[in-house]
Amino acid sequence: MIYLIRHAHAVPAAEDPLRPLSLAGVHECAMLVRFFADNRLLLPGQIWHSPLSRSRETADRLTAGLNPDAARVEIPGLLGDDDPKLLLERINALPPRSEIALVGHNPHLTRLATLLVRGRSKPAFVDFKKGSVLALEKTESRHKRSDLPRWTVRWFLPAQLLKPRQATAPAQEA
């Protein structure tokens, strides 16, 4: 199983060119960790991340909160504009029952997910908002046109599902 995770919110480039996680991003990571720890849906043995601060920091927080023994590995091919085919061989060579999380950026994650599920990288079938997670499982079949191994969606957690709702004041009568 692989888990594609878009990094949490980062500070604007004008504020810090390295774009570390913002306070909102730190809270998003905490909500992700709490949800996955409570539901035992995500226990990766490895967490791959891009070299960018926001991806690395998201991976650090997931590792610390979900599996401190997980190997956290910076790998090439996870930047927003990278060709998703760069990771295909590495992903498809994973041993059965591997639990790997990939923390990256858009539009790369959307293209990678679409390539794994549909055998081509366009048109996209998923919208990765920051902090969203998609779980994919490799099947025994292959895509007819591309002959790539076929992956199936196990579940998708859009980030907005974990955000606390704002309380609204009851309507006042006139």
What are these model-derived regions, one by one?
Residues 1-85, 89, 117, 128-129, ...:
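Active-site-proximal alpha-helix that buttresses catalytic centers in soluble enzyme cores
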Residues 2, 96-104:
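Generic beta-sheet signal
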Residues 73, 79-81, 145-174:
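Functional cleft and adjacent loop/helix regions within the main domain
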Residues 90-95:
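Conserved phosphate-binding catalytic cores of ATP/NTP-utilizing and phosphoryl-transfer enzymes
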Residues 121-154, 162:
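Domain-level recognition of soluble alpha/beta enzyme cores
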